[in-house]
């Protein structure tokens, strides 16, 4: 049973890895081509580009962690290699979450219609607001790196002191749990901001539909379509990142560390977020969707030839 489950999880993980690289690679390629051909790229184009790059790094980091664990178990978990892997994961995870949150804020400010002076002030200065948020989240990243680096230093000291294999394994379980808890703690703020943006956009859509109903106009006007499309992208991000959270909590289950399948299962669940959300971004953005249709048409023509 354990062997069969392991094989199934391996197949699913490889499929997610390929799918994630294809979808995120497509976003990177599309925006790079647009930038090179037009010599310019929209602000959201840059956000999409760096979001996709961060997710490619995150996907590869998760795969490398799995391969290292399968080959060397706990014996490699010390030194510069551990530091590089941990900090790369922290940085890629940070930007993957924060850039998606910035997209959610962009949808809210661009699409929602509120008459509050504060909202109108932010709406008219949307690029400056998003740039300030982007710069401000670097403070979170700095503190996160400092905290993780402290845990790494503590683990390195314990690794040198503890000679027996069992003691090193137990110490690493404690170290990994601390790192995961830090990741969860630093993810709460951007996730909450994205959730609030989603709720406000729902409220904006409700108000808009009320106005449309009173004026006896159709409900499928451009503003309604923009609201619905943005909400689809935002709810998919929230749900998929929630599964990513769940993968963290799975890794925190004490008994799972003794069975060997915890890493496989948590990585399989975790990979679903960076792989799938980028596909939804492609479907939700007209330029990416148009480019994907051109690629599919080209491939079909090549297949017929």
Swiss-Prot record:
Claim: Membrane is one of the keywords in the record: yes
Cytoplasmic side: 29-42, 110-128, 204-232, 284-305
One GO BP annotation of this record: positive regulation of cytokinesis
Tissue expression notes: Expressed in subsets of taste receptor cells of the tongue and palate epithelium and exclusively in gustducin-positive cells. Expressed in 15% taste bud cells in circumvallate and foliate papillae but only in 2% in fungiform papillae. Expressed in the duodenum, antrum and fundus (part of the stomach).
Tree of life domain: Eukaryota
Subcellular location: Membrane
Molecular function GO terms recorded: bitter taste receptor activity; G protein-coupled receptor activity; taste receptor activity
Transmembrane domains' residue ranges: 8-28, 43-63, 89-109, 129-149, 183-203, 233-253, 263-283
Record carries keyword Cytoplasm: no
Membrane-protein topology: Multi-pass membrane protein
Keywords associated with the record: G-protein coupled receptor, Glycoprotein, Membrane, Receptor, Sensory transduction, Taste, Transducer, Transmembrane, Transmembrane helix
Spans within the Extracellular topological domain: 1-7, 64-88, 150-182, 254-262
Principal subcellular localization: membrane
Sugar-modified residues: 162
Function: Receptor that may play a role in the perception of bitterness and is gustducin-linked. May play a role in sensing the chemical composition of the gastrointestinal content. The activity of this receptor may stimulate alpha gustducin, mediate PLC-beta-2 activation and lead to the gating of TRPM5.
Family: Belongs to the G-protein coupled receptor T2R family.
Note: Most taste cells may be activated by a limited number of bitter compounds; individual taste cells can discriminate among bitter stimuli.
Full protein name: Taste receptor type 2 member 13
Annotated organism of origin: Rattus norvegicus
């Amino acid at each position: 049973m354990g062997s069969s489950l392991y094989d199934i999880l391996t197949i699913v993980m490889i499929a997610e890895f390929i799918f994630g690289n294809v979808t995120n690679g497509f976003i990177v390629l599309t925006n790079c081509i647009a930038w090179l051909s037009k010599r310019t790229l929209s602000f959201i184009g840059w956000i999409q580009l760096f979001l996709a790059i961060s997710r490619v790094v995150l996907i590869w980091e998760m795969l490398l962690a799995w391969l290292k664990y399968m080959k060397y178990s706990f014996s490699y978990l010390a030194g510069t290699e551990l530091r590089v892997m941990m900090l790369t994961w922290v940085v890629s995870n940070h930007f993957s979450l924060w850039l998606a949150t910035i997209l959610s804020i962009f949808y809210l400010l661009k699409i929602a219609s509120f008459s509050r002076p504060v909202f109108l002030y932010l709406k008219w200065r949307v690029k400056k607001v998003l740039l300030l948020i982007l710069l401000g989240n670097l403070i979170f990243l700095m503190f996160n790196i400092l905290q993780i680096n402290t845990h790494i230093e503590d683990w390195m000291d314990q690794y040198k002191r503890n000679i027996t294999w069992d003691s090193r394994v137990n110490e690493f379980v404690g170290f990994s749990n601390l790192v995961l808890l830090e990741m969860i703690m630093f993810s709460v703020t951007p996730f909450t901001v994205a959730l609030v943006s989603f709720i406000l956009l729902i409220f904006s859509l409700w108000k808009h539909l009320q106005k449309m109903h009173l004026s006896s106009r159709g409900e499928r006007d451009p503003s309604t379509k923009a609201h619905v499309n943005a909400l689809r992208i935002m709810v998919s991000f929230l749900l998929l990142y929630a599964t990513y959270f769940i993968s963290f909590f799975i890794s925190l289950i004490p008994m799972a560390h003794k069975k060997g399948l915890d890493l496989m299962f948590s990585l399989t669940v975790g990979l679903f977020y960076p792989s799938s959300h980028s596909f939804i971004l492609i479907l939700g953005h007209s330029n990416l969707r148009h480019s994907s249709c051109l690629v599919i048409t080209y491939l079909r023509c090549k297949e017929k030839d």
